[in-house]
C-alpha cells in the first residue's frame, strides 16, 4: 500500500488541518516555499549541498530555512523520526496544489 493510497482516503478538510498544524502561522506563499525546499531535500536524500545548489541558495541559507521550519513545526527534517511528519505534510500540500 502506498502513501498516496492512504492519503486519498483522508478528507480534504483533515488534510488542510494537518497543513495548518505543521505550518502554523505561515502564509500560503511561505508554505509553498517550504514545500519546494522539502521536496528537493527529500529528492536529494537529505543532501544539504545538492538541495542548496538546486535552490540556488548558499548552504547556510538552506540551514537557516531548515531551522526556521523546525521552529515553526516542531519537527526537524534532519532527524529520521521527525522527518516523516514533514514528508507527509509535503505530500499533502502537493496533492492540494500548493
Regions found by a protein language model. Give the residues of each.
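Cytosolic nucleotide-utilizing catalytic cores of signal-transduction proteins
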Residues: 1-98
Amino acid at each position: 500500500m502506498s502513501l498516496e493510497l492512504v492519503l486519498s482516503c483522508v478528507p480534504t478538510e483533515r488534510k488542510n488541518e494537518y497543513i495548518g498544524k505543521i505550518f502554523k502561522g505561515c502564509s500560503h506563499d511561505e508554505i509553498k516555499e517550504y514545500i519546494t525546499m522539502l521536496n528537493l531535500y527529500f529528492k536529494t536524500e537529505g543532501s544539504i549541498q545538492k538541495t542548496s545548489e538546486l535552490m540556488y541558495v548558499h548552504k547556510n541559507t538552506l540551514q537557516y530555512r531548515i531551522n526556521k521550519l523546525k521552529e515553526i513545526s516542531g519537527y526537524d527534517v534532519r532527524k529520521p523520526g521527525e522527518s516523516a511528519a514533514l514528508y507527509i505534510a509535503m505530500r499533502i500540500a502537493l496533492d492540494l496544489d500548493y
